Amino acid sequence: MKLYMVPLAPNPTKVMLYIAEREQLGVHMDIEQIVVNTVKGRHKEPEHLARNPFGTVPALELDDGTFLVESLAIVEYLEAKFPKATLYVGTPEKIGKAKDLERIIDLRLGGPMGTYGHATNSPLGRPPEPEKAAQCLAAMQAPLDYLEQLLSDGRPLLGGDQVNVADCTLQSSLQFMRFVEVDVFGDRPLLRAWDERYRARPAAQAVLKW
């Protein structure tokens, strides 16, 4: 299989962190990772559009030559294809809560973070949009408070003692925030401590560039 990605973008980074975490658990998927240079517009060229007609990354080329183009679908496909030492473990209730947490982070936090970054210091050269940035910053506060409260029980990772996809999703967006030089934590020491712990993990050390 081949993963077409770009190291900074949150959605590809989520998948890359997921793969690296599974590697740390002894699951070797043999997925080649290929950079698509989005700064040069390679994601909008015919070669990549043949993989993903929406012109986004990531795109996972399967062994049969077809593609998956949504990050969470890629993760769940790999969970099913390599069912040993997965990141979704435990009772149906525990798995449901882990998936719920990942969606909260991706939809309620990751989206505003990405828009905020591009509205303030876009790596793609987009013009600043102060009003949009202010709206996104306001939207981030409730989910950030939710995560701070979640960590108040002493858990080392977002889902408890074991890493899950929610950790990968949050860290992928935070890397983008670091790149655009934005500190989103504010007065949230537990989230800041989680960030330091997660970034010290071998998987994070192998994947994160910022």
Describe the function of each predicted region:
Residues 79, 173-174, 208:
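Active-site-flanking alpha-helical
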Residues 1-2, 155, 209-210:
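Generic structural signal for short, solvent-exposed loop/turn connectors between secondary structure elements
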Residues 89-90, 159-160, 207:
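Short histidine-centered beta-strand/loop micro-motifs
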Residues 105-200:
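GST-like fold's C-terminal all-alpha helical module
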Residues 1-134:
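GST-like domain detector, emphasizing the conserved glutathione-binding G-site
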